[in-house]
Regions:
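N-terminal mitochondrial targeting presequences
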Residues: 23, 37-50, 58
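Active-site cradle of extracellular carbohydrate-active enzymes
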Residues: 259-315
Length: 450
């Protein structure tokens, strides 16, 4: 089931005060609804909808009464404001997303998980995070004020007041300031991390290969380039990288914020994904599947990809560029029969292209396979969907990253397949070890154990 523009429009009503006839700004709407949550009682439907999700095992934990009340208030507010006759069509996707998120934070609170400042995870935090996410999606993901990723290489929107080593001249542009409005100072990178971090069981998560990460950071510091060849498991993988690197230390956390992610069309067009993408350094590249899906737009998409390649080459020539790319071109999908989750195969041509760009840059470019375990955090659909707006699932779960040994960028064209095979094998090995360490052996494909 997909999120359409009309479905996202209901978020406006969800983030507005029930009794107000005044047109509020996004932030005013949030303040109004938060106040309403505290001061009013809503008649929420007590019937739980049967989950339509076929992407992961059903949540078996029980939501706490406090989180349940906050969730029901949120869903009731949404339902009460939907146009007559549209409830059944519009309510389910957003209600499912809300339910999933509140359940995950309830599980986090029950486990004793804490926020980075040591505070407890609360229903109020779930309300604030969800309302903020939906309001950003409404404001920047659709309609006249939709944020347009005008450049194939997007730089993270960290806010006009962000204290970095350089000044972001974009915030001097009057048109951008007008579009962002009160959010001109919003750090969308931090907002994305704040949304997903409570759903990550960081205490029981794993970051292995930290010596390799340290080496990669030193190479970046020396003006060289690093490419992480990763498997891809969830929409929240950029936040997974950031939040796990933060657990290592400030230096690693700062490094995560500077990584550039190679992204497909969905992250810049799906209304709920747009605000999270605004906070990331991106290279927007259409996958081969997406290019071939529509013959009429194929030439334009191919030109955009060429522009992205040229932009990436420019960054590599400058040096000090860290890139995260999933050579498979998409997320890992579970085997619906066995329940195992194999890594999607690395695409030879994709790996070749990044090696070529590294060589053409005339700067030393280093390649590190990166294994990721994040499937349970935001389980993807079991089958690839061409459109945007997939159903969102969220779980409280441990996650893991393994930075594997560097694969030397050597060898001619006749042996290029050996490089890809080596990188994929390293990723599979790291992935298998992570699953064992996280006590998720049930996901290990039989062929990985041989």
């Amino acid at each position: 089931m997909k999120f359409s523009s009309s479905i996202l429009a209901s978020a406006l009503l969800f983030s507005a005060s029930c009794s107000s006839a005044v047109a509020f700004s996004t932030h005013q709407r949030l303040v109004s609804l938060r106040t309403t949550f505290v001061s009013s009682t809503f008649l929420a439907s007590t019937a739980e909808k049967e989950s339509e999700c076929s992407t992961a095992e059903s949540t078996t934990t029980t939501i706490s009464p406090e989180f349940e009340a906050a969730r029901d208030q949120a869903i009731a507010t949404l339902k009460a404001q939907l146009p007559p006759g549209t409830e059944s069509k519009l309510e389910a996707p957003l209600a499912h997303f809300i339910s999933e998120y509140f359940q995950s934070l309830s599980d986090a609170a029950a486990s004793g998980a804490k926020n980075p400042d040591g505070s407890s995870i609360t229903p109020q935090q779930a309300v604030k995070n969800m309302l903020t996410s939906l309001s950003y999606a409404l404001k920047f993901g659709m309609g006249e004020g939709k944020f347009i990723f005008e450049n194939v290489r997007h730089r993270a929107m960290r806010g006009a007041d962000f204290n970095d080593t350089t000044t972001d001249a974009r915030y001097e542009d009057e048109a951008l300031k007008e579009k962002l409005g009160p959010d001109v100072t919003t750090d969308f990178y931090a907002a994305g991390c704040d949304f997903f971090r409570p759903s990550m069981d960081l205490e029981h998560s794993i970051v292995s290969g930290q010596d390799n990460l340290k080496k990669a950071m030193e190479q970046i510091e020396a003006g060289e380039n690093v490419v992480f060849l990763a498997n891809h498991q969830s929409e929240a993988d950029p936040q997974v990288v950031s939040c796990l690197f933060e657990t290592i230390g400030k230096e690693a956390g700062d490094f995560a914020a500077h990584v550039t992610y190679v992204a497909g069309h969905k992250v810049t067009t799906d209304a709920l994904a747009v605000p999270f993408s605004m906070g990331r350094n991106l290279l927007c590249i259409h996958s081969k599947k997406h290019i071939d899906a529509d013959p009429e737009t194929k030439p334009a998409k191919s030109r955009q990809n060429m522009s992205a390649m040229n932009s990436m080459l420019g960054g590599l020539k400058e040096g000090g560029m860290a890139i995260w790319v999933a050579p498979s071109g998409g997320r890992d999908r579970r085997d619906v029969e066995s329940g195992k989750i194999p890594i999607a195969p690395f695409d030879q041509k994709t790996v070749d292209m990044f090696r070529l760009m590294g060589n053409k840059s005339k700067k030393p470019t280093h390649f590190y396979p990166m294994a990721m375990v994040s499937y349970d955090l935001c389980p993807p659909p079991d089958f690839v969907e061409a459109g945007v707006g997939e159903k969102r699932n969220v779980r409280f779960t441990p996650i893991g990253i393994a930075i594997c040994d560097e694969v030397p960028n050597i060898g001619g064209a006749e042996k290029r397949h050996l490089f890809t095979e080596k990188a994929e094998a390293e990723c599979i090995q790291g992935y298998t070890e992570l699953l064992k360490g996280l006590k998720m052996e049930k996901y290990i494909p039989e062929e990985y154990s041989s």
